[in-house]
């Protein structure tokens, strides 16, 4: 089972990715993790990636596709894999197709922008333990304090409104066109496309995914 997750940052993909991995026994493939592993291993692709990153440049689509191809031949991908955060653009999706990387399901998590902003800017973190709260959906017992230690909670830089809105603009410009791309692919019988209502409670979204994936 080869799955791509689409959706804006904060649409709840991470939570459901965890569930899919455990339920179906497939690994999540993160391009960031792959790049770091390739550089560490000193493989030919890793050396190329290191040179590009050391020069402060962005790694090319060709190189990322080559890494994905190499990664999915590994034993843990025998039953499939889950891609989140890749492809980000139509040229990347085309390159994947040309490289013969077929996908069984494309799952789109649909959540309105304002709700995403609400979800993210309400997050509060206890830095030392990694505990995450939400002022509206999962508040601490005492406002602004960690339940366990009573220490101050903070807001991550990534969770500030300006940053969140910037990331949403980027998503709509670059990644949202993939929704149309994969809808067409599904009509052509090359994959199955499903839109999931990410505004529903986690358990309901999970049940919907089980229905889709079987």
From Swiss-Prot:
The gene is adk. CDD domains: ADK. Its EC number is 2.7.4.3. Catalyzes the reversible transfer of the terminal phosphate group between ATP and AMP. Plays an important role in cellular energy homeostasis and in adenine nucleotide metabolism. It comes from Enterobacter sp. (strain 638). It is an enzyme of class 2 (transferase). Keywords: ATP-binding, Cytoplasm, Kinase, Nucleotide biosynthesis, Nucleotide-binding, Transferase. Monomer. Residues 122-159 are annotated as: LID. Pathway: Purine metabolism; AMP biosynthesis via salvage pathway; AMP from ADP: step 1/1. ATP binds at residues 10-15, 123, 132-133, 200. This is Adenylate kinase. GO terms for biological process: AMP salvage.
